[in-house]
Amino acid sequence: NKIFLDYEAIEKIIINNQELKSLEALVNSSRFNLSSKVSKKFPTLNLQANGLPKYVAGKNFNSNTQKTKTSQFSANPSLNIRLDLIDPLRDSEIKIARESYKIAKNNFEIKRKDLIQEARARYHKYQKSYQDIENKKLTLEASITSFKNAEAKLKAGIGTKFEVLEADAQLSRDEQILNEKKIQHEINKISLREILDIKDEFEIKKSQKLTGFWNYKLNKNLREGLQNNLSLQNLSLQKEIKKNQSINYSNAYKPSVYISNSFSSGFTKGDAASISLDSSEYGSSYTNTISLNFSWTIFDGGENKNSYKSSKAEAEAEEFSFNNLKNILKTNISTAYLNLKLNEEKILSSLKEISSTSESLRLARLRYDVGISTLKDVLVRQKELSNAKSKNINAIYNYNLTLDELERLTFLEKNKDCIEKDNNKNKSICNMKK
């Protein structure tokens, strides 16, 4: 059974994309890394045991003393606790890990939104290919009609062989174009299946409609787009990471202080270095050592000093990248906004052109039927109508693409209803059905 793929469901289905799953794993990795860095605030506890148990057996011979023997079991567990009181690197490392985690989450969201936009674009393209096929089918039917009319007139003695050949050539061209559109349709289907990771057969709504309206002014587009852009946020976070890295290198010359407590114990059973072994002998001992420790790197050949300068320079570079991306986003948002307005005009003008060329074709056929026009005129009008329909299909396709692009760039949602001050019955995108 075929599943029905709805345009609105793309956002939910895209989570199956393999590339997105890969980025999700990286988010988890960054989260675990952050937890690892935060854990440095807490004490560490280590348990060691040298032989659990350990058995020693042997003999010792010396010409000046009596021979001794050893046969003994022993265990020497120790417990060590360490707490870093002053760690000059810890806070900046935690900040770096936290900012890296935010970047990983932003990267996931950036890719998710990019994939949604790309999947929607492929959906529109697949839907458009349905309309292209229907348009070329109608064109082919018109060419068949023209060919039959030319043959009929030739048989009746009022037509020419040239007109028949001309109609036949046009028919062949239209058949070839239709075949190309069908192949492109299958390619578009494969492309949509790949990005959504759909295993089963599926179908979509074939009719091409506007997916929404855009009622926001350009200033609001720019303001929201710059405030909410995740790539800009990532560059700011990268800058903070570089700053914290430079702090890390600077703090490497500061002392670290930690307190440690070591508890060691020993248990024995048996005898050691004895003339006469006593297997029932046993003993135990313990020591507890608590200390305040100090570590300070005085000189490292300038390694951390130069690394500090390097990170500061990289932070400045991120600032330039931020400003550059900001300018690019302003251009992209403004371009998309103006393209949307342009496509609105193209939709309306192409509808008017379809109406005019349809009437022109009808009149051309009537003139040809009564013998006051040529087949060439009919074929020209026929091609004009097909081109007008193609313009309308492309205009709706580009309108929907630009609408999705504006959503992606500004983080605003498209509107279901159209609000336009200069709306009138004769010429407005608001009068088109979604």
Please give the residue ranges for each predicted region.
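Amphipathic alpha-helical coiled-coil segments
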Residues: S22-K37, K111, L115-E134, T145, ...
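Periplasmic alpha-helical coiled-coil/stalk elements that build and connect Gram-negative outer-membrane
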Residues: N1-E8, D114-N228, A336-N339, N343, ...
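A glycine-/polar-enriched beta->alpha junction
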Residues: E11-K21, N28-P43, S78-I96, N106-K113, ...
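Short helix-capping/hinge motifs at transmembrane helix termini and TM-loop junctions
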Residues: G157, D197-I198, G371, T410-L412
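Small/polar, glycine/serine/threonine/aspartate-rich low-complexity segments that form flexible
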Residues: K2, Q48-L83, K206-F213, I247, ...
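Bacterial Sec-pathway N-terminal export signals of envelope proteins
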Residues: N1-N50, R98, L196-Q245, T297-I298, ...
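Acidic, low-complexity, intrinsically disordered peripheral segments
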Residues: N1, D6, I10, K391-K434
